[in-house]
Amino acid sequence: MIEKQSDNVENLEDNVSQEVNKNEDSSVIENQTSEDKQTLEVDDENIYAEDLKNTITNNDARLEQLEKEHETLKSQYVRIAADFDNFRKRQSRDQDDLKVQLVSKALTAILPIVDNFERARQQLKPESEEAQTLHRSYQGLYKQLVEVLKQQGVSPMRVVAQQFDPKLHEAVLREPSQEFNEDIIIEELQRGYHLEGKVLRHALVKVSMGPGQQNSQEPEEKDKVEEDIDSENPISEEN
């Protein structure tokens, strides 16, 4: 009986010892697992931090590249816009110049007709009623033609007593003058015209050589020049 109880005691001690060992092993395993878990968490945090750092670095590099590309495209846009604006202005200027050239050509062809009307008005002195009626008729046409020229921007030059300017005038004759200083226009032989501020036709003029100067042209040459002009008188400024 005593032996049996002794065995039971030993078995109980063994069970207790096993249970204690089991608990100790379990505690060790739990501690190890906790440490491993903490280690894994630290590693994960380090990996995440490294990845985040790399991502930020890559994004910064990409942002810098995009900013450079943006500046390049912006410069190209500004240059293209400026080129287009210059092209548009050049086209507009060329069109205006072409228009002026075409209008100038047409108007220049009309001016001799205007000169003939003016010459007829000054030279012809109709006496009969029929001749006066005819004279008034073509002078009415002349005034209409003058009005059309004005509407197109044509304006006559005023040259007498003005300083000779080769950009505006063509000196056909030169002679001494007690009234006008040298290079002052004495007489207008053919009217000059402006078109929108530009010279449409140069004025043919007689220019003073100043007092006491000798005429550089012989009378025959002077007569020839006046004959070449065909004794044309300029258009008057009145309607």
From Swiss-Prot:
The GO cellular component terms are: cytoplasm
Compositionally biased, Polar residues: which spans?
Answer: 14-32
The source's superkingdom equals Bacteria
Q: Where is this region: Disordered?
A: 1-39, 207-239
Q: What is its main location?
A: cytoplasm
Q: Which SUPFAM superfamilies match?
A: Coiled-coil domain of nucleotide exchange factor GrpE, Head domain of nucleotide exchange factor GrpE
Molecular function GO terms recorded = adenyl-nucleotide exchange factor activity; protein homodimerization activity; protein-folding chaperone binding; unfolded protein binding
Q: Which GO terms describe its biological process?
A: protein folding
Family classification: Belongs to the GrpE family.
Its function, per the record, reads:
Participates actively in the response to hyperosmotic and heat shock by preventing the aggregation of stress-denatured proteins, in association with DnaK and GrpE. It is the nucleotide exchange factor for DnaK and may function as a thermosensor. Unfolded proteins bind initially to DnaJ; upon interaction with the DnaJ-bound protein, DnaK hydrolyzes its bound ATP, resulting in the formation of a stable complex. GrpE releases ADP from DnaK; ATP binding to DnaK triggers the release of the substrate protein, thus completing the reaction cycle.
Subunit text = Homodimer.
Write down what this protein is called. Answer: Protein GrpE
Name of the gene this protein is made from: grpE
